[in-house]
């Protein structure tokens, strides 16, 4: 079988692999970064992924505390740096570094690389009181990293429409990406965010795109959504996860996923060996919206939008 890879084009003209197959958060997240918490398993998964064909998209973040593992894997691979797309995030809510610039300098040192391909503000919750700079000032810091070449692209994560509007008022460089929770059961993390990003040429990245399968029970098999995904899985001879991930990309969204199983990592990197029709994409969208909203993260803050957001 021939290998197919697809890319999204960002608003600055740069290309980004259309799926991130190694997310180093979620299952790999840890509360401290020590020799005792070092995960050889994560290193093995990254090294395995880096042996696959194509440009490999790895998603990291300050808050995950997995820089040592990413750095170790990068030191072991024979894949050239320009065949690796590395995303990192400054996490203001945990105050591990003084600013985006400080955070990135620490990250680059720990990962043993001179630059990241994408650097994100992990949340909009930046304040003078906690971080010593406002959201707008944090974005200006991000722009300097972009201009210096330490970050080839810059963006945000978990931003609502009003947060992006604040950034856009002062931006010399528009965010290239907004990484949010997105799945068939949560098609707007906050009201109107998917449409707003599309209208402003900001690529949406989806974390937890497979939430519906993660939380699926035996009783769910008879629900219309899962019945239809199974039908498509049998039609295309693909896993149900591949069907959902392909739906995500057909919505113009970049899925961020990961697995400890080599076959699933390979399946994700080979996602573009098949396609869904427009009708199939629309039906998954409709059946997903009919299902009760499923939010895995930020429930305290954004849970109030669960039903209203899906109607936008």
Swiss-Prot record:
Broad class of the protein's primary localization: cytoplasm
A GO molecular function held by the record: alpha-ketoester reductase (NADPH) activity
Top-level lineage group: Eukaryota
GO cellular component, one term: cytosol
Enzyme Commission no: 1.2.1.-
Sites bearing Phosphoserine, chain numbering: 123
Thermal dependence of activity, per record: Thermostable up to 40 degrees Celsius.
Localisation: Cytoplasm; Nucleus
UniProt keywords, alphabetically: Cytoplasm, NADP, Nucleus, Oxidoreductase, Phosphoprotein
Classification via PROSITE patterns: ALDOKETO_REDUCTASE_2
Binding-site residues, NADPH: 25-27, 59, 157, 179, 208, 210, 257-261, 264
Active site: 64, 122
PANTHER family tied to this protein: 2,5-DIKETO-D-GLUCONIC ACID REDUCTASE, NADP-DEPENDENT OXIDOREDUCTASE DOMAIN-CONTAINING PROTEIN
Subunit structure, as described in the record: Monomer.
Name of the protein in its database record: NADPH-dependent alpha-keto amide reductase
Organism: Saccharomyces cerevisiae (strain ATCC 204508 / S288c) (Baker's yeast)
Lineage of origin: Eukaryota, Fungi, Dikarya, Ascomycota, Saccharomycotina
């Amino acid at each position: 079988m021939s290998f197919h890879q697809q890319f999204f084009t960002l608003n600055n003209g740069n290309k980004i692999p259309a799926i991130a197959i190694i997310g180093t958060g979620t299952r790999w997240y840890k509360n401290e970064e020590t020799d005792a918490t070092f995960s050889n398993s994560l290193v093995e998964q990254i090294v395995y992924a880096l042996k696959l064909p194509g440009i490999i998209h790895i998603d990291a973040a300050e808050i995950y505390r997995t820089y040592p593992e990413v750095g170790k894997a990068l030191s072991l691979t024979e894949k050239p740096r320009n065949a690796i797309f590395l995303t990192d995030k400054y996490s203001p809510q945990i105050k591990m570094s003084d600013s985006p610039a400080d955070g990135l300098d620490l990250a680059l040192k720990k990962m043993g690389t001179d630059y990241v391909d994408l650097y994100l503000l992990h949340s909009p919750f930046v304040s003078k009181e906690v971080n010593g700079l406002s959201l707008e000032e944090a974005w200006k810091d991000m722009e300097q990293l972009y201009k210096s070449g330490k970050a080839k692209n810059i963006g945000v994560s978990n931003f609502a429409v009003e947060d992006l509007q604040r950034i856009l008022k002062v931006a010399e460089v528009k965010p290239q990406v907004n990484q949010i929770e997105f799945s068939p059961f949560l098609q707007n993390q906050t009201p109107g965010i998917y449409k707003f990003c599309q209208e402003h040429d900001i690529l949406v990245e989806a974390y937890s795109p497979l939430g519906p399968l993660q939380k699926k029970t035996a009783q769910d098999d008879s629900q219309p959504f899962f019945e239809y995904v199974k039908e498509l899985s049998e039609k295309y001879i693909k896993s149900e996860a591949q069907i959902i991930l392909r739906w995500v990309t057909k919505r113009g969204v970049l899925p961020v996923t990961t697995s400890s199983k080599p076959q699933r990592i390979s399946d994700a990197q080979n996602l573009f060996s098949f396609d869904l029709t427009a009708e199939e994409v629309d039906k998954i969208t409709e059946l997903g919206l009919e299902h009760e909203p499923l939010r895995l993260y930020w429930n305290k803050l954004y849970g109030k939008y669960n039903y209203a957001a899906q109607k936008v």
